[in-house]
């Protein structure tokens, strides 16, 4: 059965890649036009404290750049988060990402979104300090704590976008953890005592939100009615999550949460929330925790892209 699953994934990925290539070619965009049409932004906290307890709600001192004609150029937060009719898609990367790698990753995601998009969008990456250090387990624990604290910035960004009719969020690994925490804080929840000092406006949002998680490094119970991020789904229209029951990193997730028997949602899937559609990608990606393996080898990632783009056909193209 495992072999049949891998054969299915190989066939599905081939079809997915061929369709994507044809769609790009049909756009008639040469390389230069492709660069000029990008609307990709970076909001960075890499120059700030790793694990903030609070942020300034008026001016959180974020650094902003826009990818324009082949290079990253300085911009303002007002420009990055303006509501101009385009669909805002916010991406939060995972662990052990240098600044340059994060920038390359968001451009790769933009390529895949553009191949399936039927509407204009604005892709905004929240880049946080997650580079690799000499001690992997200790550094992963520190970055997990940092991703929890950076939920404050996700919540702040969501509040700036609160008047957008639709918002999409994509997170990989610890980035998914930041997104879930940010949604929880924006809805009035608390994490490690942060809420009282955030200054985040928790008035009801006008936005409908769609979320895509890839290998989420968070406990599978956190989105249950009594979970740590229980308010995260308050304004969420739907969550599509990809996990890998062969993930060698998330299999050891319990070591991140000291004194617990936690099981990662990216390893065994979420429990206790009917808003979540999820797929086990182990037959496709195998023993890895590499985000790019989901992009290249998992046909279900196409569903995530459609979900984030609010494509009308997403309900009809589910892969069972």
Label each PLM-derived region with a short phrase.
Residues 163-171:
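Alpha/beta-hydrolase fold nucleophile elbow
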Residues 171, 175, 179:
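Gly/Ala-rich beta-loop-alpha elbow adjacent to hydrolase catalytic centers
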Residues 1-9:
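Bacterial N-terminal signal peptides that target proteins for export
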Residues 86-94:
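Short beta-strand element of the alpha/beta-hydrolase
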Residues 27-82, 95-97, 103, 107, ...:
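Lipolytic serine-hydrolase domain surface
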Residues 9-18:
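Bacterial N-terminal signal peptides
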Residues 99-100, 177:
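Loop/helix-junction capping segments adjacent to catalytic residues or to phosphate/diphosphate-binding pockets
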């Amino acid at each position: 059965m495992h072999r049949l699953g891998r054969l299915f994934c190989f066939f599905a990925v081939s079809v997915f890649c061929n369709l994507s290539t044809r769609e790009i070619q049909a756009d008639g965009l040469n390389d230069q036009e492709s660069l000029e049409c990008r609307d990709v932004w970076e909001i960075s906290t890499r120059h700030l404290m790793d694990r903030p307890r609070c942020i300034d709600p008026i001016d959180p001192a974020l650094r902003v750049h826009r990818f324009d004609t082949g290079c990253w150029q300085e911009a303002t937060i007002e420009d990055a988060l303006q509501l101009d009719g385009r669909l805002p898609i916010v991406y939060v990367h995972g662990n052990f990402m240098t600044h340059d790698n994060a920038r390359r990753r968001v451009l790769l995601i933009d390529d895949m979104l553009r191949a399936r998009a039927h509407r204009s969008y604005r892709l905004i990456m929240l880049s946080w300090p997650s580079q690799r250090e000499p001690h992997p387990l200790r550094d992963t624990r520190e970055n997990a704590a940092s991703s929890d604290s950076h939920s404050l910035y996700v919540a702040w960004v969501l509040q700036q976008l609160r008047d957008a009719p639709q918002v999409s969020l994509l997170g990989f690994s610890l980035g998914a953890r930041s997104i879930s925490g940010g949604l929880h804080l924006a809805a009035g929840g608390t994490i490690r005592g942060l809420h009282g000092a955030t200054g985040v406006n928790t008035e009801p949002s006008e936005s409908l939100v769609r979320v895509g998680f890839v290998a989420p490094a968070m406990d599978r119970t956190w989105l249950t009615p009594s979970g740590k991020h229980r308010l995260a789904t308050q304004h969420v229209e739907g969550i599509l999550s990809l996990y890998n029951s062969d993930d060698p990193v998330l299999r050891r997730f319990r070591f991140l949460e000291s004194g617990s028997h936690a099981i990662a949602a990216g390893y065994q899937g979420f429990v206790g929330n009917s808003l979540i559609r999820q797929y086990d990608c182990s037959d496709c990606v195998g023993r890895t925790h590499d985000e790019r393996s989901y992009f290249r080898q998992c046909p279900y990632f196409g569903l995530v892209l459609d979900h984030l783009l609010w494509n009308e056909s997403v309900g009809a193209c589910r892969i069972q």
